[in-house]
Amino acid sequence: SLRRQRQMCIRDRHYYTLLFDKEEDMDLVGDTSLTSVQVEWIFVKTRMMKKYYFERIKGAWILEAINLRPIERDENEDFVEFFGHFATDSLFQSQRVREPLAFVTTDPDDDFSVLETTLDLNQWFAFKPALPAERLSNINYGQRNDDGSPTKILALKGIGNGFSNILYFRRKAGEWELYKFEDVSI
């Protein structure tokens, strides 16, 4: 059941992930006028996506359908396959982190402002969050999530703990690279 899967996610890791193709789409999170959302599980190793379709009917969210599909392949490097490798192989990861890496974080002297700076590769390995390797979750609020998109944003959001990391990826010469990292945890 969805509840059991969600509880498993919460128990295994105290955060969930969201995927976006572009920054503007991140504004859709929390839109109270929405009447439909999809909750997605992306299974990295099997390259499958399980999607739960919910509709808001008379104020209540109702599960309308469940769909399971393979993730499309094209001539470019597939993001899910890339991310599975990136999350589990530090040597591969070191080849796919742009140097210098753009870094945004909260100002330690002022919680209400952010610092924009850069990290070198060693600093990335010191600051990086634990990355999900088995599966990604996604709540689709209406944002595009195109398998062929040249950019992907992976948000890791804590459940009741203030954790917030955002990883920005883009395709460069057909290969994915991490080019920006945000840690705005509180």
Predicted segments with their positions:
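Surface-exposed beta-loop interaction hotspot
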Residues: 55-95, 103-115
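Hydrophilic extracytoplasmic domains
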Residues: 128-186
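Mature extracytoplasmic domains of secretory-pathway proteins
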Residues: 110-131
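Short beta-strand edge/turn micro-motifs at domain boundaries
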Residues: 38-74, 162-186
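Short, small-residue-biased leader/transition segments that mark boundaries at the very start
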Residues: 3-10
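Extended alpha-helical surfaces
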Residues: 96-99, 106, 140-145
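Short amphipathic beta-strand and strand-loop transition segments with alternating hydrophobic
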Residues: 15-29, 138-144
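Short, hydrophobic/aromatic-rich segments at coil-to-beta transitions
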Residues: 30-40, 147-156
